């Protein structure tokens, strides 16, 4: 339980347990794909996905920074994350770490069954989303939020702020 008795359940697929979970709450915050919520009855929105390749390197640093984006056409990945720099490259005792782990992020086409990451911003998908938004507006108990629920590109700081603001206004 969290503040004001908001129950949080992890590793629970809302859509597989929708009836039981809906019965427990006055409001639902749904951040999954809006088209999935409505069982794709108007059609499937398009998304982009990503895949990751992880590598343990036998050296103390690869890029000296947590995240580096690559925007040139010649580089096949879009980003490299060097995880140790989120903790400033030190262990719990403040010692330098002798190895590093990197993750290369590759953009990939999305197909049903893949993890959707980013909405496809074009006229066709915008029009289909507008129709789903009408259905969503008719669901007063459900707050649709996030990249997938609003079918909108957000940086993570933006989506966290938007969801917190929305919850603040809806739940108080």
Each predicted region: which residue ranges?
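Mid-domain catalytic core of redox enzymes
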Residues: 12-135
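Generic hydrophobic/packing signal
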Residues: 6, 31, 79-81, 159, ...
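General small-molecule cofactor/ligand-binding pocket signal
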Residues: 7-11, 143
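Short, small-residue-biased leader/transition segments that mark boundaries at the very start
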Residues: 1-2
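C-terminal catalytic lobe of FAD-dependent flavoproteins
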Residues: 115-172
């Amino acid at each position: 339980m969290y503040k004001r008795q908001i129950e949080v359940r992890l590793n629970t697929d809302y859509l597989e347990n929708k009836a039981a979970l809906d019965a427990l709450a006055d409001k639902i915050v749904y951040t999954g794909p809006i088209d999935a919520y409505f069982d794709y009855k108007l059609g499937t929105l398009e998304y982009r996905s990503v895949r990751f390749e992880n590598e343990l390197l036998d050296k103390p640093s690869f890029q000296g920074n947590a995240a580096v984006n690559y925007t040139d056409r010649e580089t096949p990945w879009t980003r490299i994350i060097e995880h140790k720099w989120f903790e400033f490259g030190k262990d719990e005792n403040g010692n330098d770490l002798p190895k590093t782990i990197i993750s290369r992020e590759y953009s990939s086409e999305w197909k049903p069954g893949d993890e959707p990451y980013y909405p496809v911003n074009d006229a066709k998908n915008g029009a289909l989303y507008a129709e789903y938004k009408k259905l969503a507006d008719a669901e007063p108990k459900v707050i649709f939020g996030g990249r997938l629920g609003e079918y909108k590109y957000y940086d993570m700081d933006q989506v966290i702020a938007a969801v917190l603001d929305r919850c603040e206004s809806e739940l108080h």
